[in-house]
Design a protein with these regions (language model features):
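Helix-biased detector of long, well-ordered alpha-helical tracts
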Residues: 1-318
Length: 318
């Protein structure tokens, strides 16, 4: 099967024509992938936001991970970065390195997931590069747009700002541990839930939706506490109410019903949640909650910015 695939699609152009051309959505600036470069129209009242991420086999994903999961991960990590800056995606470039184990079915599932996500979040593939090596790796550069007055950064919080978190945290960590043979008392349904939380992360685009009310923002890729520290100015700190940090009922049940030697701080410090931590003036509280409800986004106020440096969690400094 793989020999037939390699014989039939024995050049970069043939693979691109078969699997990737559909992803350009026939946008004029892509030149249907016939040129060596593409272009984007600029926007008078918007800033162009650029972010890039790389994921590597045996570091960011496993060899046997489903190809649609790998596609979802490379898209999610970039959309999450854009959202944290108050931006929505326009397009992206993709550099994909494949090896001899990649076949027709793998590429079909991979590009089908890309197509679905592009449709869902309204962006398209501008171009990229395809190469071969011993390990699979992907690097994507995303271009987004944001209104000039609403671009977000990590250093604009003020003392007294509320600290908010979207979604639930920690489920991805449990999924990763299950895939690494952690023995937990879980039925197949709950086990699948946690594994899918790791394999199929979902970006939260609330940064764009609420950008006019947000003072600072970051996505949770390196863990709640690690990323929160990045939001704090040198002379600012945070008071966090740990019991308010949102975790799913499934995770809470797991912690209560298993002999689990990890604390909630350990779980929250792992990362790969791709939710948002953001700060906002308390006067915008009701408007932010209203936007979250309208867009069916879970939102939790977990603390506030304080003058004393450091992160304080239930009166314990971390």
């Amino acid at each position: 099967m793989k020999k037939k695939f390699l014989n039939k699609y024995n050049s970069e152009k043939k693979i691109i024509d078969k699997f990737f051309k559909i992803l350009n959505f026939k946008k004029q600036g892509t030149f249907n992938f016939e040129n060596d470069a593409a272009y984007l129209n600029t926007y008078k009242k918007n800033k162009l936001v650029i972010t890039t991420d790389t994921i590597i086999e045996n570091l960011d994903f496993f060899e046997n991970d489903p190809p649609d999961s790998i596609a979802q991960k490379i898209i999610c990590v970039n959309l999450s970065d854009l959202s944290s800056m108050g931006s929505i995606p326009i397009g992206y470039t993709l550099n994909l390195t494949i090896n001899s184990k990649i076949d027709y079915i793998w590429l079909k599932k991979f590009t089908n997931k890309l197509y679905h996500l592009q449709k869902k979040y309204n962006f398209y593939l501008l171009g990229g590069d395809l190469s071969k090596s011993t390990d699979v790796s992907l690097s994507a550069t995303f271009f987004g747009k944001v209104k000039s007055n609403y671009i977000l950064s990590q250093d604009k919080s003020s003392i007294g700002d509320e600290i908010w978190v979207t979604g639930n945290l920690g489920d991805s960590y449990i999924g990763y541990k299950i895939l690494n043979n952690l023995n937990l008392k879980l039925d197949s349904k709950n086990k699948k839930y946690f594994i899918n939380s790791y394999l199929y992360p979902k970006p939260c685009m609330f940064g764009y939706i609420a950008s006019k009310y947000i003072s600072s923002s970051i996505d949770i890729s390196d863990g709640f506490y690690g990323d929160l520290k990045k939001l704090l100015k040198d002379n600012y700190g945070a008071m966090i109410h740990q019991k308010k940090i949102p975790i799913s009922k499934k995770l809470l049940n797991l912690i209560q019903n298993n002999n689990f030697n990890k604390t909630i701080i350990d779980i929250l410090s792992w990362g790969d949640d791709y939710e948002l931590i953001f700060t906002a003036n308390v006067k915008y509280r009701h408007k932010i909650i209203k936007l979250a409800n309208l867009n069916k986004i879970k939102l939790t106020s977990v603390g506030s910015i304080i003058k004393k440096t450091g992160i304080y969690d239930d009166s314990l400094k971390t």
